[in-house]
Amino acid sequence: MTEEATAQQPPVPGMTGPRRAAVGFIFITILLDMLSIGMILPILPKLIESFSNDNTADAARIYGLFGTAWALMQFVASPVLGGLSDRFGRRPVILLSNLGLGLDYILMALAPSLGWLFLGRVISGITSASISTAFAYIADVTPAEKRAAVFGKVGAAFGLGFIIGPAIGGLLGGVDPRLPFWVAAGLSLCNALYGLLVLPESLPPERRSPFRWKSANPVGAVRLLASNSRLAAMAVVEFCAEVAHVALPATFVLYTSYRYGWSETKIGLALAFVGVCTAIVQGGLVGPALKRLGERNAQIIGYGGGALGFLIYALAPTGALFWIGIPVMTLWGIAGPATSGMMTRLVAADQQGQLQGAMTSVKSIAELIGPFLFTLIFAYFIGANAPFALPGAPFLLAGVLLSVSVLVAATAGDARQRVPAG
């Protein structure tokens, strides 16, 4: 990514030049991370299926176990890395995470068996804190009242990565199913080198806090979320949304391949379209939506759009109708930045890293539950023992969970007051 590309990122009102540049660095870091992840997304489930004698139900169960193992490692490691980022700074944690991700992709590119693939996912889970630390980085350099908008701008990197990544991954996977892993490894390692050379530290020594195992363990980190009733309510909203979100990576590839007969290339293009819609929402709609609707209404509309999108996914009888659900689903993108912005104002300045570590733990708990839950439901409802065939059952459950997020967001207290530094 060039300096010109960085300069093209929209300026954020109320931010100085150095702060805008720092957010630009984080934008590129997240973009390269998501590009790498997006490249292997259409391929990994099919690679597992090839190790499972092309049995879709068995591959779904194994893929769910892979996702659960990855989330377990992230759940244990993320609070530790969040606490370390509060103590030693964000930069070393981000660099370590990118290095680990690159090694993970190399291992998977060489994996001769499911066991080696599994080991690669374990390594990735341990070092997967770069996103949460990147959000803590943003909290360091962004005024509290501007954070939701900046989270939305940086969130566009997720969409851009998923525009390019799945399309490239699908095309490369058509040549060789291992090739996307090699390219993803190269991108991740280049990202680590990029950060080593140009990424400045965002947390000055005077704002750092001591590392405490009590807060760094997963239970201690999550305990922060119970310190405030509004924070706890937002954590419930985020937890339900995170569990629902797991339905997409857990079953999207296997579902569309099984129900509509899509190839890796077509799946990659569909995921790229998801990325296009996400980038439009995150990059163009989040700021105006937050300004016009307010954070709570943005949550309600966003999570509600996601629930409707899941309903379309579950019931669409043809692939053409499934495509209609994609832009509806991506309205969900206006809800996440609103929730993140509200939560950062409910903790002190020296707890931002701990908050992001805690929220990563919440996400990890969701990802512990979600992959196995959704793939098991999918495998059951396409199996011979199901009372009726319903391959879209995982998406129906995800829609119910997002409806819970809507209900809690609509009834929770406001989050306008910022907690003073303690």
Question: Where do the model's predicted regions map?
Answer:
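Cytoplasmic helix-loop-helix junction between adjacent transmembrane helices
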Residues: 120-159
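Short amphipathic helix-loop junctions that connect adjacent transmembrane helices
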Residues: 43-60, 250-267
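Multi-pass alpha-helical transporter architecture, strongest
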Residues: 192-198, 396-422
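Helix-to-loop junctions at the C-terminal end of transmembrane segments
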Residues: 77-89, 281-295
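C-terminal transmembrane helical hairpin of 12-TM major facilitator-type secondary transporters
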Residues: 296-339
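Conserved MFS/SLC helix-loop-helix module at the cytosolic interface between two early adjacent transmembrane helices
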Residues: 75-114
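Juxtamembrane intracellular "pre-TM" segments in multi-pass secondary transporters
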Residues: 8-20, 200-237, 259, 422
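A membrane-interface helix-boundary motif in multi-pass transporters
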Residues: 173-186, 376-400
